[in-house]
């Protein structure tokens, strides 16, 4: 007989009755019934009930003193449970093991929180004792699910002709839009490596190297603040790059992967392929967001022209100054109490708006509300037609400069979807957002900057760049840039790449970079492009966000084995931490006085 186990704790069935077995695991629960002691023994696979009887009083007494989460090995005989004690919620619920002997492999101290329930525990304690937290069923299953998803992704990608690569972790800084994690070089004092924000340049260089289809389950490092769907330090993505492809080729390659994943690991309805494509400008108009949740049926409409010549002075004057008006329908909300509309106004104000106009259209078509008296009957009918409003609906209005009005309307749309319970249930709705602006105005400097990935190919190529003379014309340029969105969550960005040096130099010069700066920052890739680069493109769906959706987790930390907390700390391993002066000297690093003071305190 094996030293620790002959079976796992999810394995024994009626067919095993009268078999002598050995099991090992953690004490999940213990129940003392006087002449009987029951222990639920748990391992990675499941739970088996162990019974100790008064036929062996010492063994039963020893079992009654076992602490929860102690690790034990039990030898005994499988017996059938009586009809009234069968537990149909367990795969092993028709049997139990009558213990003959047990040994304690490792006794547990007093637990900082309860393991055998999903009851919330303080997050700090959970992170400090993550090894205990990971024993809890839901979190344990999430980590298993993550492994299964990644394994299936590898299978799908390999079956589609992709080759898996590993790219460097120690590399140079790149302009991915976030702060780098820097690693000082001992051999080159004063110089630093950067942990990759993404393997962007390496995967493009692999295409230039003659490989055709690349993928990697890639670790990415960005010094960002934590969010519910974003880790503050490290995340993983399905990094993909392909040679000789158009935007549509990327779509037709990734869509089956997403569809297969989401249909395999959930019973919910999944968008059929091909996924709907929505141009960026249309998405901002209809949904007030570049990551729309298509489970929400509300579609925003532009009603600027209706208010341009209206008697509603506030909107009319705003329009004269360049503002717009967006209408956000609220289906079947006309009869709701005044408190609902007041709550929506409070929400808009909390989002920075001056207020939120609205109109209610009764079931008979009567219009009422603070805006009604400023509109003619013809304007009201035009409003209903333009915004697809029916009798019984209400409609809210957002007026501001184009970008602000669109974003406010989008937030109101989301809030209405929640308040009115409009979201379609039990489904995953995918879409592509395409034709992103190539440039944007930097809010801090007021200068032209790249909107997304600077390595994207501008639509129209170098001709489009050279023909755009004014700031307005530059801001109208679009890129072969695309996002894939599911239920309002951006799963990935991707692009057809700029593989021509002359276009890259021109694109960067418009954003204020000289050729020398481009060569300095991206010399390796520029050099490669001068020796025959294929047209190529790619995408990088976020593994963590995919797992979050499939696990129905509300926080990214619930699908990562050892995450950082919101302050980017690892409370289990005590990272980040101060290091000895000797190590700093080897790296030619000197702490600032304030940092030195903090180090001395520790």
Curated annotation (Swiss-Prot):
Binding site for L-aspartate: 176, 222, 452, 497
Subcellular location per the Swiss-Prot or TrEMBL entry: Cytoplasm
Top-rank EC class of the record's enzyme: ligase
GO terms classed as biological process: aspartyl-tRNA aminoacylation
Coiled coil ranges: none
Function of the protein: Aspartyl-tRNA synthetase with relaxed tRNA specificity since it is able to aspartylate not only its cognate tRNA(Asp) but also tRNA(Asn). Reaction proceeds in two steps: L-aspartate is first activated by ATP to form Asp-AMP and then transferred to the acceptor end of tRNA(Asp/Asn).
Documented EC number(s): 6.1.1.23
PANTHER family in the record: ASPARTATE--TRNA LIGASE, MITOCHONDRIAL, ASPARTYL/LYSYL-TRNA SYNTHETASE
PROSITE patterns linked to this entry: AA_TRNA_LIGASE_II (PS50862)
A Pfam family it matches: tRNA_anti-codon
Protein name as annotated: Aspartate--tRNA(Asp/Asn) ligase
Residues flagged as site, Important for tRNA non-discrimination: 33
Principal location class: cytoplasm
Region (Aspartate): 200-203
Similarity comment: family membership: Belongs to the class-II aminoacyl-tRNA synthetase family. Type 1 subfamily.
Recorded GO CC terms: cytoplasm
Matches recorded under InterPro entries: Aa-tRNA-synt_II (IPR004364), aa-tRNA-synth_II (IPR006195), aa-tRNA-synth_II/BPL/LPL (IPR045864), Asp-tRNA-ligase_1 (IPR004524), Asp-tRNA-ligase_1_N (IPR047089), Asp/Asn-tRNA-synth_IIb (IPR002312), AspRS_core (IPR047090), GAD-like_sf (IPR004115)
Sites where the protein binds ATP: 222-224, 490, 542-545
Known partners and oligomeric status: Homodimer.
Keywords: Aminoacyl-tRNA synthetase, ATP-binding, Cytoplasm, Ligase, Nucleotide-binding, Protein biosynthesis
Domain of life: Bacteria
GO molecular function: aspartate-tRNA ligase activity; aspartate-tRNA(Asn) ligase activity; ATP binding; nucleic acid binding
Catalytic activity: tRNA(Asx) + L-aspartate + ATP = L-aspartyl-tRNA(Asx) + AMP + diphosphate
Species of the source: Rickettsia africae (strain ESF-5)
């Amino acid at each position: 007989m094996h030293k620790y186990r002959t079976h796992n704790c999810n394995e024994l069935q009626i067919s095993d009755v009268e078999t002598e077995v050995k099991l090992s695991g953690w004490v999940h629960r213990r129940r003392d019934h006087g002449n009987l002691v029951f222990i639920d023994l748990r391992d990675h696979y499941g739970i088996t009930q162990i019974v100790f009887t008064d036929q062996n009083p010492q063994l039963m007494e020893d079992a009654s003193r076992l602490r929860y989460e102690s690790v034990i090995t039990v030898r005994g005989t499988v017996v059938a449970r009586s009809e009234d004690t069968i537990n149909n919620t367990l795969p092993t619920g028709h049997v139990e093991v009558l213990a003959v002997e047990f040994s304690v492999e490792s006794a547990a101290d007093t637990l900082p929180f309860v393991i055998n329930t999903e009851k919330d525990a303080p997050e700090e304690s959970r992170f400090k004792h993550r090894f205990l937290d990971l024993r809890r069923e839901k979190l344990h299953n999430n980590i298993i699910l993550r492994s299964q998803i990644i394994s299936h992704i590898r299978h799908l990608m390999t079956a589609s002709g992709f080759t898996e690569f590993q790219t460097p972790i120690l590399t140079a800084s790149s302009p991915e839009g976030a702060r780098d994690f820097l690693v000082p070089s001992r051999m080159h004092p004063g110089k630093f490596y950067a942990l990759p924000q993404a393997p962007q340049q390496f995967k493009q260089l692999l295409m230039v190297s003659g490989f055709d289809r690349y993928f990697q389950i890639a670790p990415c490092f960005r010094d960002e603040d934590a969010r519910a769907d974003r880790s503050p330090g490290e995340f993983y993505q399905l990094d993909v790059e392909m040679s000789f492809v158009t935007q549509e080729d990327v779509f037709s390659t990734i869509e089956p992967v997403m569809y297969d994943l989401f249909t395999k690991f959930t019973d919910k309805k999944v968008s059929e392929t091909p996924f709907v494509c929505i141009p960026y400008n249309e998405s901002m108009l209809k949904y007030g967001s570049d990551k729309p949740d298509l489970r929400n049926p509300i579609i925003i409409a532009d009603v600027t022209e209706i208010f341009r010549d209206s008697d509603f002075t506030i909107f009319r004057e705003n329009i004269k100054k360049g503002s717009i008006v967006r209408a956000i329908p609220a289906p079947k909300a006309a009869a709701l109490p005044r408190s609902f509309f007041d709550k929506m106004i409070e929400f808009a104000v909390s989002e920075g708006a001056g207020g939120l106009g609205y109109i209610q259209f009764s079931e008979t078509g009567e219009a009422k509300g603070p805006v009604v008296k400023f509109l003619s009957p013809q304007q009201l009918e035009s409003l209903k037609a333009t915004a697809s409003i029916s009798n019984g609906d209400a409609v809210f209005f957002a007026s501001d400069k184009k970008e602000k009005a669109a974003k406010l309307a989008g937030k109101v749309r989301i809030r209405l979807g929640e308040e009115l319970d409009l979201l379609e249930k039990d489904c995953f709705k995918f879409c592509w957002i395409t034709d992103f602006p190539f440039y944007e105005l930097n809010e801090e400097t007021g200068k032209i900057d790249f909107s997304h990935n600077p390595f994207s190919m501008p639509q129209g190529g170098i001709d489009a760049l050279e023909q755009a003379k004014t700031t307005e014309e530059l801001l109208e340029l679009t890129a072969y840039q695309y996002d894939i969105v599911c239920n309002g969550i951006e799963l990935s960005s991707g692009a057809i790449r700029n593989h021509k040096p002359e276009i890259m130099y021109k694109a960067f010069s418009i954003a204020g970079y000289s050729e020398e700066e481009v060569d300095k920052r991206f010399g390796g890739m520029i050099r490669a492009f001068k020796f025959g680069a294929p047209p190529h493109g790619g995408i990088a769906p976020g593994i963590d966000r995919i797992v979050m959706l499939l696990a129905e987790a509300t926080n990214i930390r619930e699908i990562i084995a050892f995450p950082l907390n919101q302050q980017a700390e690892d409370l289990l391993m005590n990272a980040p931490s101060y290091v000895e002066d000797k190590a700093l000297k080897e790296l030619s690093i000197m702490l600032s006085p304030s940092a030195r003071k903090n180090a001395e305190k520790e």
